[in-house]
Design a protein with these regions (language model features):
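Active-site microenvironment for binding and transforming phosphate-containing groups
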Residues: 1-288
């Protein structure tokens, strides 16, 4: 796999692709944001479908234990990503996503949650930490990953934002938790809106469109296109960009994806493109 295999929405190099070679000889392609590497003490990635050992509709790097895949295969997939991130399974801390705006601070005692150990929490769509070595993990198949790096206070955050999280301003909630827990200044945070469904692929009903029109009053023309018959095209990328800028993220500190999961169903899992027959992609973020 190389970068040219993807269908990009434009030619900007917002995301790059690297090939990690595991100790067992397996190759693992991972997407990453160069902007977040401006702070050299951070590793970030977003997985593709390739480089794992799952089969069938889960081919091949599925990261979901709850959709019917072989648990041993899923665990091995996690191990490969952890290795690429310079860690082990016991370094990963997973969210428990239920489309909330709940954000939890995690520490070394949380290592392995969601992979090698049961999580003692539920309904957590965002994670933050200031502990080096922990690998934050959230999961996707069209929803929006949000990455946060505070290079001044050496803290990171990773959040899942579907349409409910976006209209609930999940990005703002994550920044507020980082401000409270680590004294982060939004003007110093580097942020990224990760691969997810684009506006051309994301048709929503009138009730969802109305919720966005109310929350993003004044920005309706930027995020919604009326298609008729009570249907609209919704731009989650622009919506999250607005949320993050409203929360104080500077334009030069923000990267917004140009890669759609639904446009690339052979390389990325997409719930909409597969009609629900799919695995999960993962966003990962680590302080070194």
């Amino acid at each position: 796999m190389d970068r040219e295999d993807f269908q990009w929405k434009n030619k900007e190099h917002i995301l790059e692709l690297e090939q990690f070679q595991g100790k067992k000889g397996q190759g693992l392609p991972l997407l990453y944001f160069p902007l977040l590497l401006a702070h050299t003490g951070v590793k970030n990635c977003f997985t593709t479908r390739e480089g794992g050992c799952s089969t069938g509709m889960f081919r091949s790097l599925n990261l979901s234990f709850t959709r019917g895949d072989n648990p041993q295969a899923v665990t091995e997939n996690y191990r490969r990503v952890a290795e690429a991130m310079g860690g082990t399974l016991s370094d990963i801390v997973c969210s428990d996503q239920t489309h909330t705006t709940n954000v939890r601070r995690v520490d070394r005692s949380c290592g392995g949650y969601g992979v090698t150990k049961e999580r003692p929490y539920t309904d957590v769509d965002g994670l933050v930490t200031d502990e080096p070595g922990l690998i934050l993990a959230t999961f996707y198949a069209d929803c929006v990953p949000l990455y946060f790096v505070d290079p001044i206070h050496h803290a990171i955050g990773l959040s899942h934002s579907g349409w409910r999280g976006t209209v609930g301003r999940m990005g703002q909630h994550t920044i507020e938790v980082m401000r409270r827990e680590f004294h982060s200044d939004p003007g110093e945070i580097l942020a990224a809106v990760g691969p997810s469904i684009c506006k051309d692929c994301y048709e929503v009903s009138e009730d969802v469109a109305s919720a966005f029109a109310k929350e993003f009053s004044g920005h309706e023309c930027e995020i919604l296109i009326e298609k008729g018959g009570g249907k609209y095209q919704l731009d989650l990328w622009k919506s999250n960009e607005i949320v993050l800028k409203d929360a104080g993220i500077l334009p030069e500190h923000l990267a917004v994806t140009n890669l759609c999961t639904c446009c690339n169903p052979n390389l990325l899992f997409s719930h909409r493109a597969s009609h629900g027959k799919r695995g999960n992609l993962g966003a990962f973020l680590k302080l070194v």
